[in-house]
Amino acid sequence: MYTIHFYVLFVLLTVRCSSSFIGNGENYRRNLSLELNPGLNSSLMPLPPGVGLLHVRALGKNNTLHYLLCSQGAPALLLVHTNSTSSKVKVDWPAFLVQNTTGSLKLTPESSVLYSNTLVFTRLWEYDDVNDTAVPEHLPPSSFFQPYELQNFTWDDLNKTLDPMAYTALLCGRDASESFSNGSLCLKFSAFDVEGRDQGWPSLLHNANSSQLRVVLDGVVPRSNRSRFSLELQVVGGTQSMSRVDVLRSIDDEYTPSIFKVSQWVSSPVNSTSPVLGYAQWKPVAYRRPSPVFEDATPCRHSTPVPIAQLPPSGLVLAYYGGESQTTGLNMTFSITGDPFYNTTNYLSWTVLVGLGSPPVDSFSPLVLVIMAVGLGTPMLIILLGGVCVCVRKNRPQPQVYEPIN
């Protein structure tokens, strides 16, 4: 009886400890506020079509995160961490709209800035995968179509898709070509005030120090029957830009079925054991339908990050950093050999998390830990009960078979 009680207590403690471990970020919460085009008087200075600047302020106990999503030029997401709870964004709008003026966007006080990085979406590559290899770097230049330069896209008004209650916004853009006559490339931005996960795959774990971008290529007419796509990304930072991609492995695919890896494009001091300063994190999977099932998943892979000599064509980058910042870039390639081509569904989505500090780490859910505890604990319980029974039987006094004669 005591053994059974001990086993039940063990399972309950396991569930309690696992829940506390998994939810250790839930106690940290930021207060979020959103504003569109901060400091702009639209009646005096109307914005050009397709230009917008979304500012999300994430206030902590003694610091502030600032997210700025901008559609001027190539779409970009700027993350700035300050050690002040009163830091503010200041935009010199006449200079900002010129696109060639450095310092037209600032965080004040400037001395409060601890870290910053900008993720820029620069190009969408399309190639004719005649031999079904899904390895564009091994294809001749003739297999590639003219890339879509995202700086030339016409972007929708962010004000129409802004959701202040959910802290989300949808930025959709189109090329002037016929391929985008009924299609679009969209970036769904989400900011988070506390730890949690998205309901839909890939269900990335986020916390109060992170934001998320979901890239969706929908309804675009491919230029060949065997077209596949790659997305070019660039990162601009101060003294510590994102220079390497770490790939971590796991034995658990509970939240993203069949995916046992996570990739992290991280920023850390050179030749230092210091923790990660910032990151872009994703799972190597994309989906071919808006509400995917298991068969709609397709793997994706990244190239090795390389330094780039010039800044990306983003108005936000030049306005904040000027011309003296480190830039690295990589390509994200979707699909593998044997997978359906883009024209099968004319849909592709991929999700990336952008945040401060070390990336969130997946761990087993309480349900999985209970199953493991029961699966491993039941054999132990049987062994313990068997041992107890054997000991009891051995210690029980045995009746004498032969009675001596007096």
Swiss-Prot record:
Keyword Repressor on entry: no
Sequence motif: Lysosomal targeting motif, positions: 402-406
Membrane topology: Single-pass type I membrane protein
Major location (coarse): membrane
Lumenal side: 21-367
Protein's UniProt keywords contain Iron: no
Domain of life: Eukaryota
Signal peptide residues on this chain, from the entry's feature table: 1-20
GO BP annotations listed: protein localization to lysosome; protein stabilization
Subcellular location, record wording: Lysosome membrane
GO CC, one annotated term: membrane
Annotated disulfide bonds: none
InterPro entries in the cross-refs: NCU-G1
Sequence intervals crossing the membrane: 368-388
Cytoplasmic-side positions: 389-406
Function summary: Required to protect lysosomal transporter MFSD1 from lysosomal proteolysis and for MFSD1 lysosomal localization.
Subunit structure comment from the entry: Interacts (via lumenal domain) with lysosomal protein MFSD1; the interaction starts while both proteins are still in the endoplasmic reticulum and is required for stabilization of MFSD1 in lysosomes but has no direct effect on its targeting to lysosomes or transporter activity.
Entry protein name: Glycosylated lysosomal membrane protein
Native source species: Salmo salar
